[in-house]
Every structure is written in C-alpha cells, then in structure tokens.
Regions:
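Small-residue-enriched hydrophobic alpha-helices in membranes
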Residues: 1-65, 75-229, 233-267
Length: 267
C-alpha cells in the first residue's frame, strides 16, 4: 500500500492547524488509493525514463524558443531561465543540460513543431503532465516580463498543439499571478499586501471555482486540483524528479486556498 499521499497531505495540513492535518491525511489517503489502482497500468520504468527526459528537454528548449520570440533574449529572460533551474534544484550536470536545451531552442532552425509533436506523443493520456509544462512556461515568461507582445499568442499556439486551450492558459496565468507567480518572486519570498477580500477571490481562482458554487462543488474542485497536482501521480506519469518541487508548491497553494474558503464558508 502507498503512504506518500497521506504523509505529504498530513505534513502540509499541519501548517494549517490540526483540522488541516486531518483533512490532508484523508485526502492524501484517497489519492493514494487512486494511485494504487493505477499501478498495474503504469508504463515500464524505461518508458517512464524516456517520458521524463523528453519532458525535461522540451521544457527548456521551448522556453528558449519563447524567450527569442521578440527577436532577442534579454538578460532578464536569461536570469528567469536560471531562476527556473535554481528553483527546480537541478544539479550541475542537469543545469548544463538545461542550458544546452535553452540555447538550442533559441536557434533559428529550431524545429518547434517536431519538438511539440514528440512531447505530445510522450504525454498522450497524461493531461496533468501537459498542464505542468504549460505552468512552467508561463511562470518563466512572468519572471522575464516576457508574456506580452508576441509571446502570449505564440505560447497559446504552443499550448494548443498540446491540447491546452486559451481559456485554460488564461486560468493558469491568473492563478500563477497570485502571490507573485514568477520563479524570481517565489525564490525571493516577498508577498504583496492584499486585502482579505482579494485573498478570498484569489483562493477561488486557485481552485478554479466561483463564490456562487455550492459547498459540495467547492470540495469537488479542491479534490480535482489536488489530484491534478499530486506529486506522486505526476511522478508516476513521468514528470522529471527535478520538477516535483513545482508540483509540491502548487499542492500547498491549493490546500491553503481551500482552507481559507472552508473557514469563510464554515464547511
């Protein structure tokens, strides 16, 4: 039997108080049961390794391509790419690979269509992996102040080829802008001062829910988001080990958002 979900859920929940720990363990248990049922259908280790490598290389190649979309790569965009590598806690060998991939993506002859087609094949049946890929690209663009101009429509086209709609991309951007969604902001640890009403509105965005939703719909939205970003599930589907930290941060943000809404509603 798997216990990682319960442990992760409980530890994160403890930061929210005793009740948060209980809720975290219960939901973690549900995710663990779901993952146990999936184990029999998981691809063999060598296939997961291939998926992981494809995902890693595509992440930084496409990041380099998007950084060059306006004709040049600024120092800010280079710093943003390095911030991605730092937050993902890559070792020196992986950093060098990431730099090589980023540089390859900047080249005039880079085959974006081929890269995306290969990634789409690797992630077939794994929409949560594709969403993590989109989130990382948006966060990098936010870090480099590079999401406006030609980058946004180009990023939407990239996402579309992977099955992510412009509406979903807008949702991702809205969520990542909460509490400063860039990699540089996350590493700096500073948070903007916002009102309680704004915090609550942001919490609904994190869950992709609305204030008018019924309590049971809020709980369903919470569980859906928690399952989508669960580190164990993503890792089992081929997410590189180096990118699990991103999933953990999103999971904590989801739990904090639900706890705020739960307290306000008295769920």
């Amino acid at each position: 039997m798997r216990y990682t979900g319960k442990v992760v859920g409980g530890l994160i929940g403890l930061a929210l108080g005793p009740l948060g720990a209980v809720v975290g363990v219960l939901l973690g248990h549900q995710v663990d049961e779901h993952l146990d049922k999936q184990d029999a259908s998981l691809p063999p280790p060598e296939e997961l390794t291939a998926i992981s490598e494809r995902f890693f290389r595509a992440t930084f190649r496409v990041m380099g391509y998007l950084a060059k979309a306006d004709g040049r790569v600024s120092e800010q965009e280079i710093s943003a790419a390095r911030a991605v590598m730092a937050e993902l806690r890559l070792d020196s060998a992986r950093v060098q690979q990431a730099i090589e991939c980023f540089t390859a993506g900047k080249q005039p002859g880079f085959d974006l269509a081929g890269e995306l087609a290969a990634l789409a094949r690797a992630c077939a049946g794994r929409p949560d992996l594709v969403r993590v890929f989109a989130e990382i690209q948006v966060r990098a663009a936010l870090s480099g102040n590079n999401l406006d101009g030609p980058v946004r429509p180009l990023m939407n086209r990239v996402a579309s080829r992977l099955g992510v709609s412009p509406f979903e991309m807008a949702q991702i951007e809205a969520v990542l802008r909460i509490r400063g969604g860039s990699f540089r902001h996350a590493s700096a640890g500073a948070e903007p001062r916002i009102s309680d009403a704004e915090k609550l509105a942001q919490a609904y965005k994190v869950l992709e829910a609305a204030p008018g939703d019924a309590d049971q719909d809020i709980v369903k939205a919470y569980r859906r988001q928690l399952s989508r970003h669960h580190p164990d599930k993503l890792k089992a589907n081929g997410l590189p080990e180096s990118m699990i930290e991103h999933a953990k941060q999103r999971t904590q943000q989801i739990i904090e958002a639900y706890e705020l809404i739960r307290q306000r509603r008295g769920i």
